[in-house]
Amino acid sequence: MECPNCHQNASRVIDSRPSDENRAIRRRRECENCGFRFTTFERIETAPLLVIKNDGTREPFNRKKILHGVMAAGQKRPISSDQFEQLVDHVENKVRKQGISEISSKKIGQYVMDELADLDDVAYIRFASIYREFKDMSSFMKTMEDMMAKKGKGN
């Protein structure tokens, strides 16, 4: 591995441990030439995953889009950036564990809603209001009532 400091190819691994929910290996290395220490990550190369959008077009899976959407839904809520990242990790893991090459944006949206329902009620409703494209107040209220019933807060 090339040292980022002196650009020599002689380095040794001084520590190695699982990372990213066992999907990567974090290695701490030391350059044998200059003694500089640096970290590398080894990950499994995954097949590209395509998202089928509502209009039928396909685009590469982009976790940043999901992160942006949940952060917008959770704006000014007591949700940390680590919690947002963890939510997106869970969604991506659900998708990738299926071993498929394509998935609909609707299915991804449902996974996001499932995760948000457990994290924050307000963020869930905000996300649902965009994702589900409510046509009227009664369909919006039905979603709220369903969520409250699942959480044991309603009726």
Swiss-Prot record:
Zinc fingers typed unnamed, residue spans: 3-34
One GO molecular-function entry: ATP binding
GO biological process, one term: negative regulation of DNA-templated transcription
Compositional bias (Polar residues): 1-11
Cofactor note: Binds 1 zinc ion.
Key words, A-Z: ATP-binding, DNA-binding, Metal-binding, Nucleotide-binding, Repressor, Transcription, Transcription regulation, Zinc, Zinc-finger
Disulphides: none
Function of the protein: Negatively regulates transcription of bacterial ribonucleotide reductase nrd genes and operons by binding to NrdR-boxes.
Family in the record: Belongs to the NrdR family.
NCBIfam families: transcriptional regulator NrdR
Protein name per Swiss-Prot or TrEMBL: Transcriptional repressor NrdR
Organism: Lactobacillus helveticus (strain DPC 4571)
